[in-house]
Structure formats: C-alpha cells, structure tokens
C-alpha cells in the first residue's frame, strides 16, 4: 500500500503520521506575555542540535471566529523571544493533559492544573516546578509552513540554561528510572519509558590508508 498525502483526506493522513511517528517526546512549553502565564504541551518536538544546543517544537495554527490564528504559545514567543521547555513525567501526565485545552489567552494554565512555578535563571517565563528537567530557551528562529490551519510553524530555541532536580541524578547522570518520562502515541494514547533495552553501537575500524600501513 502506498499513500500520497494529496490523495486522501487530511485527517486520514494525519492519523497515519501520528500513529507511525511514535512515541514522541512532549515539550511542555511555558511562556509569558504582558503578565499572563501560559503553559501548553506539544508532541511535535525534539532536540535538533547539540552544539549549539537547540530544541525544536511545532505548534499548529487554529481557527478563531473563522480566522486563522496562532496558538498563544507561538504568539508569546514571537513577542518575547523566550520560552521554557519542561519535560513530562508519568506523575504529571494528568496535569499536562489538562493544560492541553484550547483556553482563552487570559487563562493561567499553571493555576488551572494546580502546578507550581519555579523561577528561571536567564529567561522571564517560569518553569514547572513539578518537572525534574527544564530547558530555558532563547528564540533562534521560526519557520512557518503555511497560513491556514492546521499548518504548523517550527520554533527553534537555543538552550541557555537547564535545571536538573537532584532526585533524578545518579552518579552525576540523569537516571531514566527516576525520570519516568512519557511519550505521545496517537489519539488518546501515551507510552511510558519503563520497558527499555540496550544495544551497543557497532565498532567500525577506519579504512586503511597508505599512510596508516607504514
């Protein structure tokens, strides 16, 4: 079976995309604009560079009164050029889900989900105190893919500071068991990172050169 995006309804291809690109890590993004706190999860998310350290996530456009409009997260980042990406653990899954609603921009999702703010060091938006790892980011660039919903934009931010809770560190490294991260599947399904296995990378010898044979 071969499928071309233009040959089937958008929703059908969307289901194929989200069911096969999974599990996806979740960026729980906190922003601040004109005194209003905003917090929302995005599963089109990943690390995109190690040096300089960059994270990227993709919020989609939405319809407001019949007009195309950016989500509050994207609007706030365009205005302030700062945001925080908080990781999502199993313990806060319900709170994360509660913040995913399409609320009015005046709604404080921290208060709605009964979450605690933790001051950031180098950016204005606060962190989610219940999240054990929070990345403070400065906007690097935004790439827009369209002007009509559900087109998205790729937001890339440079990490300027990262907060790590001591209770998820073991011998100076992040411990996956203590982190207990979750990932997004399709529909209402999520996955938990408790069933893991190890694979060692293959050892590949460099090819011989005339210089190395001497």
Regions found by a protein language model. Name each.
Residues 1-214:
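Basic, polyanion-binding surface patches
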């Amino acid at each position: 079976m071969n499928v071309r995006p233009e040959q089937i309804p958008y929703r059908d291809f969307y289901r194929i995309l989200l069911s096969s690109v999974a599990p996806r890590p979740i960026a729980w993004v906190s922003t601040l604009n004109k005194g209003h706190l905003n917090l929302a999860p995005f599963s089109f998310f990943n690390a995109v560079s190690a040096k300089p350290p960059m994270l990227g996530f993709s919020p989609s456009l939405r319809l407001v009164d019949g007009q195309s409009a950016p989500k509050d997260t994207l609007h706030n980042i365009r205005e302030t050029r700062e945001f925080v990406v908080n990781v999502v653990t199993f313990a806060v899954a319900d709170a994360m889900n509660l913040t995913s609603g399409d609320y009015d921009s005046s709604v404080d999702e921290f208060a709605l989900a009964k979450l605690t703010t933790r001051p950031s060091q180098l950016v204005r938006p606060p962190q989610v105190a219940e999240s054990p790892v929070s990345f403070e980011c400065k906007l690097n660039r935004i790439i827009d893919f369209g002007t009509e919903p559900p087109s998205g934009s790729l937001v890339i931010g440079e990490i300027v500071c990262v907060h790590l809770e001591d209770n998820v560190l073991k011998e100076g490294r992040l411990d996956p068991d203590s982190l207990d991260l979750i990932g997004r599947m399709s529909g209402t399904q999520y996955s938990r990172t408790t069933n893991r296995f190890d694979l060692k990378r293959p050892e590949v010898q460099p090819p011989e050169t005339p210089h190395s044979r001497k």
